[in-house]
Swiss-Prot record:
GO cellular component: cytosolic large ribosomal subunit
GO biological process entries: translation
Family: Belongs to the bacterial ribosomal protein bL27 family.
Region of interest (Disordered), ranges: 1-20
Organism: Paramagnetospirillum magneticum (strain ATCC 700264 / AMB-1)
Name of protein: Large ribosomal subunit protein bL27
PANTHER family: LARGE RIBOSOMAL SUBUNIT PROTEIN BL27M, RIBOSOMAL PROTEIN L27
Keyword Ribonucleoprotein set for record: yes
InterPro entries linked: Ribosomal_bL27, Ribosomal_bL27_CS
Name of the coding gene: rpmA
Pfam entry (one): Ribosomal_L27
SUPFAM superfamilies: Ribosomal L27 protein-like
């Protein structure tokens, strides 16, 4: 009789979905208040002028303007939203 021994089950086959972290608005892009600029774990980027930080370290715009990344001497990178000239009036 043709028999086949039962195959064992694989121990692989599971993976978690990515967390979609990273920079969402790059330098030079226009943002409006509430736009998410960076999603991160911990403080890889720090909030600068016109940028707020959520409890999960997400950086978001608090004013309309242009995004820029500033590198400080102590090695920290700050995300800044520079207001547009016409928006400052």
């Amino acid at each position: 009789m043709a028999h086949k021994k039962a195959g064992g089950s694989s121990r692989n086959g599971r993976d978690s979905a990515g967390q979609r972290l990273g920079v969402k608005k790059f330098g030079g892009e226009l943002v409006i208040p509430g736009n998410i600029i960076v999603r991160q774990r911990g403080t890889k980027f720090y909030p600068g002028t016109n940028v707020g930080m959520g409890k999960d370290h997400t950086l978001f715009a608090t004013a309309m303007g242009k995004v820029s990344f500033k590198h400080k001497a102590e090695g920290r990178t700050f995300v800044v939203v520079e207001p547009l000239p016409e928006a400052a009036e």
